[in-house]
């Protein structure tokens, strides 16, 4: 029996996977509806071959210091960087980030939440976590190996010779999430393990009805009911996939809309494929009456409790940021 849209959204917000049967059916339904334009249908994500998954950890101690490691690789030996590295085949994201932190710093990490997802083209993803150190011993120069030379807690990373300054924004994001308790932040979000063989983008698109002020979401108009979902084009950046998909859903003159961030992340980790599914929250300022859907999708009114839950995730920092690297 297929799940109601309300139940699907509740599961996503609570960090639970949707049934694989529902996802498989809805994926194919959408591909039929929009023709899968712009997406090579023969593409299969294979970890470290046709898709690259990176994990990184921004760990901040009680003194506000950031955990850093010194590179051992010949191309950047002596430079400093966050604990980070490639996800290995058949490895899930949590195991990957724990492994990288242990190998490069000597410390044991208990990941608590995703704080940022980055994407460069549709087949390179970096997942940034934060968490707590629960054990281990900080790596010293005497323990240097091919993974790293040493690790240390750093108060000001700008005092270091960095491998790349691309981590500065990651560290700033981590500090905002961990140390600035005055700013409301999204709840903890962890990857959900589910077999997937494609790179997928699911949209939770909202708008309010002018006549009732009730929140609506866009859903399929036939069973099994589902949120819009499409394949991510591996050769273009993710915003291109989003833009093209929104045009398919609302026509070429799609009204101004705002992508807020990630509500959920489903990741296969080699179990039934090397795919993923990002659920992105998108909102229209214009009312439902002014943004009619095309094709086989309709606006669906949400009950008050669920509308409140979705609305609470619309402000800044209330979803996991998605950074598309151009």
Where do the PLM segments sit?
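Acidic, metal-coordinating catalytic segment for phosphate/diphosphate chemistry
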Residues: 2-56, 175-201
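A conserved beta-turn-beta hairpin within the catalytic core of GNAT-like acetyltransferases
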Residues: 75-79, 223-226
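Unchanged
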Residues: 87-110, 118-194, 230-326
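Eukaryote-biased recognition of intrinsically disordered, low-complexity regulatory segments
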Residues: 72, 202-223
